A protein has these predicted regions:
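Conserved C-terminal helix/tail region of periplasmic/extracytoplasmic solute-binding proteins
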Residues: 316-353
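Pocket-lining segment of extracytoplasmic ligand-binding domains
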Residues: 182, 188-276, 374, 383-390, ...
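Bacterial N-terminal signal peptides
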Residues: 8-18
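Intrinsically disordered, low-complexity linkers and terminal regions
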Residues: 9, 342-369, 373-447
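Bacterial lipoprotein signal-peptidase II cleavage site
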Residues: 17-30
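Short, glycine-/small- and polar/acidic-enriched structural segments
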Residues: 28-175, 181-185, 200, 229
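Secondary-structure end/capping motifs
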Residues: 43, 244-323
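A bilobed periplasmic-binding-protein/Venus flytrap-type ligand-binding module shared by bacterial periplasmic
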Residues: 131-141, 231-247, 409-411
Length: 447
C-alpha cells in the first residue's frame, strides 16, 4: 500500500483555555466558534477539509477537551485559496487549507495587514510536482509545450498551477509573459473555456485535469512531475488564534491525523465519501487520493516541501504578487508536534514508495494492485465489463493516470504508459525499437 499511516497516540487532556477563538465570546461556559475555510473540490486538502468534515473528527476532538466551553465549528467552502486568505486577514476565519503558492500569498498578506499566519501542517503532496497538469482539448493538434506559442492558456494566476505553467514554459524556451496569451480564470471557468474552444490549453491543480480527462473533455499535454519539484497543500492558522487557543488548533491537527489515518486505511471508502460530498466522480478522487494515487498524505512539514516553498517565492515575486516572504518564520510545526507526539517523527521520515498499477472492480471495496502495467492490461482485457477504473503510473515520472487516457508505448514485451505525449516521444527517441500503440492495441498485446 502506498500510504504511510500516521499513528495516533493517546494524549492527555489539555488544560482549560482562557481566551476566545474567532468570533467567540469569552467566559466560562461560553460557546466558542471556530471557523474553518476549506476547498471541497481541491481534493488534496480533504484531510483538513472535506473528509475531515464528513468524519466529524474535529468536533469529536473539541468535545473531548472538557474545558467548560461548548464548541461550534463553521465550515466555509471556497473554490480557491484567495478568499480563505481574505477571510483570515479580516479576522473572520481561524484555520484554512490551500496549495503552496496561495500559502505564500497567505503569509505575505497576513504580515502586510498585521494578521500574521502560520503554516502548521501538510495535507496532500507530490515530491515531483504531479499535482498540477496542463491539458488541452481531446482533438487538439498540440503535442508539446512548444506548440503553445501564440495560443491562449487558461490558469489561475497566483496558484500552484500557474507556477507549474510558468516554470514549464521557461524550461521549454518560452516566455510566459510574451509568448502566450494567459487567461486569468477560476478553474471552473477555465475548464469551460477549454471545452468551448476559447482557450487552447488549461493549466490547473487537482482535481480539474483528472476530471476533464476522465470525462473525455481533455487530454494531458504536460505532466507537472516533469519539473521534479515538490508541490503540496497545507494548513494555515492565524497566529493570534493559535496563541489564544493552542488546544483548539491541536485538536484540529489531531483530527487531521485521524482523517489521514482513515484515508490511508480505507482509500476506496474515503474516495466515495469525498465524491458524495463534492459531486466529483469517485474514480477521479481515487486517481489523486487512492492507495497509489498522485498525492501522499503525511501531516509533517518535510524539509523538502519547505525548501520547495522557498523556491516558489521568486515566481510570485516575478509576477508582482508578493515581495519577499520569510518562509522560515511562516513555517511552525510546534502545534503538530504536540498534537501528534511520537507519530510526528514517523510522518516526517515517511518516504512515498513508487506508484503501482491498479484496477478498481465494480462493487469492490478494495482495488487490485499489479506489478506492471502489462499485468494490469491483461486483467482489464479479461474483465472489461467488470472494471470500474484502471490506473497506471507514468513510466518516467511515476504520476498515476487513467489507463485508457495514457499514451502507450510498446518496447519489446513491455507496455509503457505516459501521461503526456512529449514524454512518450522522448522515450521513443531514446529507444529505437519502441513504437507508439493505441490503448486498444496495448490491451490486445497484453492479452
Amino acid at each position: 500500500m502506498r500510504r504511510t499511516p500516521v499513528a495516533l497516540t493517546a494524549l492527555a487532556l489539555l488544560a482549560p483555555l482562557s481566551a476566545c477563538a474567532g468570533t467567540a465570546a469569552a467566559g466560562d461556559g461560553a460557546t466558542v466558534t471556530v471557523t474553518v475555510g476549506y476547498q471541497s473540490r481541491t481534493i488534496n486538502t480533504v484531510t483538513a477539509g472535506t473528509l475531515l468534515r464528513s468524519l466529524g473528527s474535529f468536533e469529536k476532538q473539541l468535545n473531548a477537551l472538557h474545558d467548560g466551553h461548548t464548541y461550534k465549528v463553521v465550515w466555509q467552502d471556497y473554490a480557491t485559496g484567495a478568499p480563505i486568505t481574505a477571510q483570515m486577514t479580516a479576522g473572520k476565519t481561524d484555520i484554512g487549507s490551500m496549495g503552496d503558492f496561495p500559502l505564500l500569498i497567505n503569509a505575505a498578506r497576513g504580515k502586510q495587514l498585521g494578521r500574521p499566519t502560520r503554516l502548521v501542517s501538510v495535507t496532500g503532496y507530490n515530491l515531483r510536482g504531479g499535482l498540477n497538469t496542463i491539458v488541452t482539448a481531446p482533438g487538439s493538434p498540440l503535442s508539446s509545450l512548444a506548440g503553445l506559442k501564440g495560443r491562449k492558456v487558461s490558469t489561475s494566476i497566483g496558484s500552484a498551477a500557474d507556477g507549474t505553467l510558468v516554470r514549464a514554459l521557461r524550461r521549454a524556451g518560452l516566455d510566459p509573459d510574451e509568448d502566450i496569451h494567459k487567461l486569468n480564470q477560476q478553474p471552473a471557468v477555465g475548464a469551460s473555456a477549454l471545452v468551448a474552444g476559447s482557450a487552447d490549453a488549461l493549466s490547473q491543480f487537482v482535481a480539474w485535469p483528472g476530471l476533464l480527462a476522465f470525462q473525455g473533455k481533455a487530454k494531458a499535454l504536460y505532466d507537472g512531475a516533469q519539473l521534479d519539484l515538490p508541490t503540496f497543500h497545507g494548513v494555515t492558522a492565524r497566529e493570534d488564534f493559535a496563541k489564544k487557543r493552542p488546544a483548539v488548533l491541536e485538536a484540529f491537527l489531531k483530527a487531521q491525523a485521524e482523517a489521514t489515518a482513515y484515508l490511508n486505511a480505507h482509500p476506496v471508502d474515503a474516495a466515495e465519501k469525498v465524491a458524495k460530498a463534492t459531486g466529483l466522480p469517485a474514480e477521479v478522487v481515487y486517481l489523486y487520493n487512492g492507495a497509489h494515487g498522485i498525492a501522499t498524505f503525511d501531516p509533517a512539514l518535510k524539509p523538502q516541501l519547505v525548501s520547495a516553498l522557498k523556491q516558489d517565492v521568486s515566481v510570485l515575486k516575478d509576477a508582482k504578487l508578493t515581495g519577499d516572504v520569510d518562509v522560515d518564520a511562516f513555517v511552525d510545526d510546534r502545534y503538530a508536534r504536540r498534537a501528534l507526539g511520537a507519530a510526528y517523527a514517523t510522518s516526517l521520515a515517511a518516504v512515498p514508495p513508487p506508484a503501482a498499477s491498479e484496477a478498481w472492480d465494480r462493487g469492490a471495496a478494495r482495488t487490485r494492485a499489479f506489478a506492471t502495467p502489462k499485468e494490469l492490461l491483461a486483467y482489464v482485457a479479461a474483465h472489461r465489463s467488470g472494471v470500474r477504473a484502471a490506473y497506471v503510473p507514468d513510466a518516467t515520472t511515476g504520476t498515476l493516470w487513467f489507463a485508457d487516457r495514457a499514451v502507450w508505448v510498446a518496447d519489446g514485451d513491455a507496455l509503457l504508459p505516459f501521461v503526456a505525449p512529449a514524454t512518450a516521444q522522448a522515450y521513443l527517441g531514446a529507444h529505437p525499437g519502441a513504437r507508439a500503440v493505441s490503448y486498444g492495441q496495448a490491451l490486445e498485446q497484453a492479452s
